[in-house]
């Protein structure tokens, strides 16, 4: 699927995402994550022993919610699946993502079991509501 340029722009900025994976009993597990985007695929890194990786190895389906950091009324909802679990022990993908969020390489250098997920988007919805984020003081 070719991503809408507005979705790509939202994913390309340092916005936090929340990934939902499925537990063995079918219940959801949601985790905040950093993400990257390349060639209409979403990139995400984690440790091999993390719950989200274990869940995705068992069932590669996932959902992502991404909200603009400065305008929480701009968001994307994404469904997809992991199409590749790639070794990232050299932190090539993780550092690329970390630079986007912090301007620095990823600080925790634990290469054993470092994995990058390559996620194929199956459905994406972009929304921008006409509201100003002005919560009461």
Predicted regions located by residue number:
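A short, polar/proline- and glycine-enriched secondary-structure boundary/capping micro-motif
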Residues: 53-59, 75, 137
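A short beta-turn/loop motif at secondary-structure boundaries
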Residues: 25-27, 68-72, 110-111
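Short beta-strand segments
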Residues: 14-48, 54-56, 64-66, 77
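Extreme N-terminal tail/first-helix region
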Residues: 1-17, 133-137
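Charged, gly/pro-rich active-site loop segments
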Residues: 2, 74-137
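Short, surface-exposed beta-strand-loop junctions and turns on beta-sheet-rich folds
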Residues: 50-52, 71, 133-134
């Amino acid at each position: 699927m070719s991503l809408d340029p507005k979705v790509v722009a939202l994913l390309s900025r340092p916005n936090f995402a929340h990934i939902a994976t499925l537990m063995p009993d079918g219940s959801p597990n949601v985790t905040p994550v950093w993400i990257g985007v390349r060639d209409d695929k979403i990139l995400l890194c984690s440790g091999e022993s993390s719950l989200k990786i274990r869940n995705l190895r068992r069932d590669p389906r996932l959902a992502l919610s991404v909200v603009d950091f400065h305008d929480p009324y701009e968001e994307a909802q994404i469904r997809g699946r992991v199409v590749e679990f790639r070794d990232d022990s050299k932190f090539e993908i993780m550092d690329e993502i970390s630079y986007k969020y912090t301007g620095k390489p990823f600080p925790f250098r634990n290469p054993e079991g470092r994995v990058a997920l390559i996620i194929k988007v199956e459905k994406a919805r972009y929304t921008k509501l006409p509201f100003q984020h002005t919560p009461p003081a």
